[in-house]
From Swiss-Prot:
Residues 35-42 are cytoplasmic. Belongs to the inovirus capsid protein family. Its main location: virion. Self assembles to form a helical capsid wrapping up the viral genomic DNA. The capsid displays a filamentous structure with a length of 760-1950 nm and a width of 6-8 nm. The virion assembly and budding take place at the host inner membrane. The chain crosses the membrane at residues 13-34. Disulfide bonds: none annotated. GO terms for cellular component: helical viral capsid; host cell membrane; membrane. The keyword Transmembrane helix applies. It comes from Xanthomonas phage phiLf. This is Capsid protein G8P. Keywords: Capsid protein, Helical capsid protein, Host membrane, Membrane, Transmembrane, Transmembrane helix, Virion.
Length: 42
């Protein structure tokens, strides 16, 4: 993990973590929404 973060500033690392969390949340919400829509129309 340390090797990956070598040469990366704290701000860049924080931005990457926030972006990753946002993507994970978006994917999770999309899957949940798809199930709701499928059950509604099903």
């Amino acid at each position: 993990m340390g090797d990956i973060l070598t040469g990366v500033s704290g701000a860049e690392a924080a931005t990457a973590m926030i972006a990753a969390a946002a993507i994970i949340a978006l994917v999770g919400f999309t899957k949940w929404g798809a199930k709701k829509v499928a059950s509604f129309f099903g």
